[in-house]
């Protein structure tokens, strides 16, 4: 059971960097 909880935490960490990269791309296109 502890292994399934670790996989859930990994997906949450990967979703945070994805939002950061999308905001950086939008700022570069506006310039």
From Swiss-Prot:
Single Gene Ontology BP annotation: spermatogenesis
Region (Disordered): 1-31
Alphabetically ordered keywords of this record: Chromosome, Developmental protein, Differentiation, DNA condensation, DNA-binding, Nucleosome core, Nucleus, Spermatogenesis
Localisation: Nucleus; Chromosome
A Gene Ontology molecular function term of the record: DNA binding
Tissue distribution of the protein: Testis.
Keyword Iron: no
Main location, first listed in the record: nucleus
A GO cellular component annotation in the UniProt record: nucleus
Domain of life where this protein originates: Eukaryota
Known function: Protamines substitute for histones in the chromatin of sperm during the haploid phase of spermatogenesis. They compact sperm DNA into a highly condensed, stable and inactive complex.
Name recorded for this polypeptide: Protamine-1B
